[in-house]
Each structure stands twice: as C-alpha cells, then as structure tokens.
C-alpha cells in the first residue's frame, strides 16, 4: 500500500510541481507577523531534555528514550514497511538485523555504545537502530540562513525538511515519515559537570547532530548535498570495511562538543573526509563569521562567506550548489533570498527570519521544525511546523 501510494504521488507531483513551484497558492508573498509562532503553520513547542556527558555512553540516552520509545518504534516500523514495500522478499531488513550489529565495534566512540544503549532501553533491534542513524545521512532536505545586521550581529535560522519519498499519506496529504518525526523532535542540552557544552535540536534515537550551537562561540547546521558520488557509496564503503571517513552527523556533533573557535570548526569541516556529500552552514560570534562549506566526500569544493563590507550580509543554502541552478521542481533558494532582500539588513531579528522560513515553498510538506539561533545572546529555539493545504510537497 505504501509503495503504491508513493508511486502515485511521485508521478502526480512530477507533473504538478513543475508548474506549481512559482505559482500561487503553492507560493505566496513574503510572510509577515508570523512570530511569536502561532496559527495553522505552528504545530507546537519542542520539549527540552538534558544529556549528561558525564554518564557512560551506554546510559546517556536512557531517560529520554524511556519517554520516546513508543514513537521511535512506530517510526522504525514505518521505515521497515517502506523498505519491504520496495523489496518484498524482506532480505534488506534481514540483512539489517543480522549484519549491521556486527559492525557496531567499528563505529567510533562514543556513538556505538550510545546506539547499543538506545537499542537495549527501547527493545528495538540494534541493527535497526544503526540503520535509523544511517537514515539521517541520506534524506535531509533543508534551508539554512545566516545573516549579519549593520552592527555585526549574527543570526542563524533553519528549516529541517525531512522524509522526501518516504511514504505519502493520501488521506491527509502528508509525508508519513515527516509526520512521525515530529513527536520524536527534541531539544537537547548536552552538559558536563552540570554546565552546558552545546545545545541541539534532533530526533530521539539519533546520536549524530544536524542542528546546534555552542553558546557564545558558534552555530552549525547540516544540509544534504546531492551528488553522483553520494552518501550511498560512502555508507557502502563503510559497511564493507573502509572506515577512513566520518559520518556527517558525527562530525557535526564532534565540532559542537569540542571546537574552541569558529576558525577551528571551519578547518575541521573543510578538511575531514566524510561518508556523504554535505553542506555545512557555520556561524560564529563576530562580524564576517558565517559561511557555507560545500563538501564532496573527500574534499571541499567551496567556502562561501559573509562579506558585509561588500554587501553580502546573508548566505542562504538549500540542497544545491550555489553556482548552479536549482532543480525546477524544488526552488526554495529564490523565495528565501527574495524575502531576505525584502526584509532588508536593518530589520533582521528572530521575527523576520521566522517570517522568511514560514513563506511557501521555503515552508513545505517536508518541514518538521524551524530553528532560530543567536550565538552571542545564548538564544536557541525550535518550533514544530505544519504546512496546511494548499502546500507544495517539497
């Protein structure tokens, strides 16, 4: 059923989206006065949990997953059903359950032990917890923004769009996995010695990070980058014994936890070999400290930085290289830039960034949450989102 409904949706969307991306009601004038969040595009707040880094890795996630185990099981079952819909023999999930646990020892610390602890506390097979974590390396469709006002103050915003082609619910026009991720969305305060090391918004059960900040120092978001030399190849290489690259979610978390400066973080994100192509959107705490790092798995292709002295007071990154045209079915870059230009540099705030991220198609059916970050003021907030019809699928 999932496979058939997905195929129907893809065929229909390919026809309609080509015409709809730049046509009302799928797009709209730049939104205003959407903040503080309310109304039909606001699903609700994201709950906070503390992750104690002083605990052994095996135990760090037990308290959180004791609350979230039922919804995590629901999502893992949905992913299994989707896989089985495309490979009815069940051999893919059999391989996940039988082969992946044997690779846990090759996952770098502390991530392997954290996954083992999550599997035990939830009762979900370890292989499926590992695959759940791999899953985030491959399906992240996002919009990230860094801005700088006339006084050199930086803001960082992002829409987390996730779940493309992962089951379409024809009864309510939503992506199955996107909707099931919303109750799994959590704000995390990672602490050591009862003091915050970094904060992040993530999904319960995932030990990497995609969105976070280190108070007073830096902010970091991760967007997927589509490439022929893509994440599937990197994951397969890792599974077959080539372990010289880091998972992108792991390197993001490591930078948030351990980096001591914007420049150090930029150097790590630019030079470290990674399993999947990606965009790292990195912000600092001083004028000009904001960039988009475009990565292949083994090298950096481009570092595009804020340059306010020459009029570049924002950077916008979706899922396409900045020097290339976006796919005509999926242009979130143009409306985001249009709305930022309409906002103007002198009016930058959490409210106006949220307005930009609330404007269709920047906001779309894949949007799980919106995050706003002010590094220097130690402000970090995330909000669950909805995109009621009429709304584009991505």
UniProtKB/Swiss-Prot annotation:
N-glycosylated. Proteolytically cleaved into two chains alpha and beta that remain associated via a disulfide bond. Cleavage gives rise to a conformation change that activates the enzyme. The same catalytic Cys residue mediates the autoproteolytic cleavage and subsequent hydrolysis of lipid substrates. The beta chain may undergo an additional C-terminal processing. Keywords: Disulfide bond, Glycoprotein, Hydrolase, Lipid metabolism, Lysosome, Secreted, Signal, Sphingolipid metabolism, Zymogen. Its main location: other. The record marks 161, 319, 332 as: Important for catalytic activity. GO terms for biological process: cellular response to tumor necrosis factor; ceramide biosynthetic process; ceramide catabolic process; fatty acid metabolic process; keratinocyte differentiation; lung development; regulation of programmed necrotic cell death; regulation of steroid biosynthetic process. It catalyses: an N-acylsphing-4-enine + H2O = sphing-4-enine + a fatty acid; N-dodecanoylsphing-4-enine + H2O = dodecanoate + sphing-4-enine; N-tetradecanoylsphing-4-enine + H2O = tetradecanoate + sphing-4-enine; N-hexadecanoylsphing-4-enine + H2O = sphing-4-enine + hexadecanoate. InterPro entries: Acid_ceramidase-like, Acid_ceramidase_N, CBAH/NAAA_C. It comes from the Eukaryota. Glycans are attached at residues 194, 258, 285, 341. Residues 1-20 form the signal peptide. One of its GO terms (cellular component) is lysosome. Pathway: Lipid metabolism; sphingolipid metabolism. The active site is at 142 (nucleophile). The keyword Transmembrane helix does not apply. It is found in: Lysosome; Secreted. PANTHER family: ACID AMIDASE, ACID CERAMIDASE. Lysosomal ceramidase that hydrolyzes sphingolipid ceramides into sphingosine and free fatty acids at acidic pH. Ceramides, sphingosine, and its phosphorylated form sphingosine-1-phosphate are bioactive lipids that mediate cellular signaling pathways regulating several biological processes including cell proliferation, apoptosis and differentiation. Has a higher catalytic efficiency towards C12-ceramides versus other ceramides. Also catalyzes the reverse reaction allowing the synthesis of ceramides from fatty acids and sphingosine. Belongs to the acid ceramidase family. This is Acid ceramidase. It comes from Rattus norvegicus.
């Amino acid at each position: 059923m999932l496979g058939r409904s997905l195929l129907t949706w893809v065929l229909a969307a390919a026809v309609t989206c080509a015409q709809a991306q730049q046509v009302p009601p799928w797009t709209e004038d730049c939104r205003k006065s959407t903040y503080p969040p309310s109304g039909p595009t606001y699903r609700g707040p994201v709950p906070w949990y503390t992750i104690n880094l002083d605990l052994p890795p095996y135990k760090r996630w037990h308290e959180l997953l004791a609350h979230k185990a039922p919804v995590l099981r629901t999502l893992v079952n949905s992913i299994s059903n989707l896989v089985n819909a495309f490979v009815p023999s069940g051999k893919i999930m059999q391989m996940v359950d039988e082969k992946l646990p044997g690779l846990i020892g090759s996952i770098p610390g502390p991530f392997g032990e954290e996954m083992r602890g999550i599997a035990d506390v939830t009762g979900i097979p370890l292989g499926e917890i590992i695959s759940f974590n791999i899953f985030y390396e491959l399906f992240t469709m996002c919009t990230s923004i860094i801005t700088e006002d006339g006084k050199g103050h930086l803001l960082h915003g992002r829409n987390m769009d996730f779940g493309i082609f992962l089951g379409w619910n024809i009864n309510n026009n939503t992506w199955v996995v996107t909707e099931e991720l919303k109750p799994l969305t959590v704000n995390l305060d990672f602490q050591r010695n009862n003091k915050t090391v970094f904060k992040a918004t993530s999904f319960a059960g995932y030990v990497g990070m995609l969105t976070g900040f280190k108070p007073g120092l830096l902010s970091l978001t991760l967007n997927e980058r589509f490439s022929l030399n893509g994440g599937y190849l990197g994951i397969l290489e890792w599974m077959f014994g080539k372990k010289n690259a880091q998972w992108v979610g792991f390197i993001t978390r490591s930078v948030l936890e351990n980096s001591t400066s914007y420049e150090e973080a930029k150097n790590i994100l630019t030079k470290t070999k990674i399993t999947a192509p990606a965009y790292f959107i990195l912000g600092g705490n001083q004028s000009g400290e904001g960039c988009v790092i475009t990565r292949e798995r083994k090298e950096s292709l481009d570092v595009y930085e804020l340059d306010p002295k020459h009029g570049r007071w924002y950077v916008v990154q979706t899922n396409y290289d900045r020097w290339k045209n976006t796919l005509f079915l999926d242009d979130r870059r143009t409306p985001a830039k249009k709305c930022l230009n309409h906002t103007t540099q002198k009016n930058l705030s959490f409210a106006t960034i949220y307005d930009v991220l609330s404007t269709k198609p920047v906001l779309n059916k894949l949007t799980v949450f919106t995050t706003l970050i002010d590094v220097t003021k130690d402000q970090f907030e995330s909000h669950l989102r909805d995109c009621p019809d009429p709304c584009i699928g991505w």
